[in-house]
A protein has these predicted regions:
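Acidic/polar, glycine-enriched structural segments that form the non-catalytic walls/loops
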Residues: 1-27, 31-326
Length: 326
């Protein structure tokens, strides 16, 4: 079997942010993640959804997939200047074979200093509640200070409709954080656990303010040195409440800690092997002169898999799959 093709975003434009966030979305049928950028943009709609996790925000509102707290967002400041792609060249692609989304940027600050910023992430096909992210920053021609802030952002809404109450947020040791949130009708809980590990000599602290639980990492780098942040996320939800809240949250945290014993590449390899077996059984190949025909078929099958909750016969395919609210 030939390797499934990739989908590439040809250029960066704030007018197509949400188009490509849907086209290049990731998932595994249990969990869907829009392909939003790590940094913020005014027109960007972030989104993370669980199959079957619906809620009605209030009287007269519709029953809809809940937009979960965001775990992708990162604020990157280099020598005090906040990173943004507004005027920069770049490359971003979604690999259908592994489900990995990759982005590489060479960015220059206002003083002309250059930096390579590379990020990649995947939603695991091997362990359904797992998301893995990695970002590397390398100064090309000057010493620099780098600040990376990331965590769990529960200010996310369904276009202004808030479905979740913050039940419990906690930090464990130097690397672990967890937020537990409850739907406003009190029927369902979701636990979002994160592990952030950074290479090299860095300083770290945590803040919890205005529904944001964040880890802040600062590093001093010489030209050519690289700082790497690996972030693992484990997402559980329940609607039966058979276990005590703390016990249930601790069980999720233990699952995340087991994953954290492996590297990003090891976790990706297990997920890629799952995708390989899936494609081997289901891929349709086209013998023809137009490569777009094969890309269209691969794209359709990829999205069919990431939106179909094959793990749970009680869940159906939502109106927008797991790429958006509805």
């Amino acid at each position: 079997m030939t390797r499934p093709v990739t989908l590439t975003e040809p250029h960066f434009s704030q007018h197509t942010l949400n188009k490509y966030a849907s086209l290049m979305a990731q998932g595994n049928g249990y969990l869907g993640l829009r392909a939003s950028h790590e940094e913020d943009y005014t027109r960007q709609t972030r989104g993370m959804y669980l199959a079957g996790f619906y809620h009605r925000a209030g009287k007269g509102e519709i029953n809809e997939l809940v937009n979960l707290p965001d775990v992708v967002g990162m604020e990157i400041a280099i020598n005090g200047e906040v990173f943004s792609l507004s005027h920069e060249a770049w490359q971003r692609e979604l690999d259908f074979a592994s489900g990995e989304l990759r982005r590489n940027v060479v960015w220059r600050t206002s003083n002309g200093s250059g930096y390579t910023i590379a990020s990649r992430r995947f939603v695991s096909a091997d362990q359904l509640p797992l998301i893995a992210l990695e970002i590397t920053i390398t100064p090309l021609d000057a010493d620099t200070s780098v600040l990376i802030s990331t965590g769990i952002d529960a200010t996310q809404t369904n276009h202004g409709r808030q479905h979740l109450d913050e039940t419990q947020v906690r930090v464990f040791g130097q690397h672990l954080m967890q937020g537990i949130y409850t739907t406003q009708d009190g029927r369902s809980d979701v636990a979002i656990s994160c592990c952030c590990m950074v290479s090299g000599d860095v300083q770290q602290c945590y803040t919890a303010k205005e529904r944001r639980l964040q880890q802040h990492t600062s590093a001093q780098l010489h030209a050519g040195e690289t700082v790497t942040l690996q972030k693992l996320v484990w997402i559980d939800w329940r609607d039966d409440r058979q276990a005590v809240l703390d016990e249930w949250g601790s069980a999720s945290l233990r699952q995340l800690e087991m994953c954290a014993q492996q590297s990003y590449d090891q976790l990706l390899a297990a997920s890629t092997e799952n995708w390989r077996q899936w494609w081997q059984k289901r891929r349709i190949t086209v013998n023809g002169g137009d490569a777009h025909d094969q890309q269209a078929l691969d794209y359709a099958l990829y999205h069919l898999r990431i939106m179909t909750p094959a793990h749970d016969e009680r869940s159906s395919i939502a109106a927008k799959g797991l790429t958006g609210e509805g």
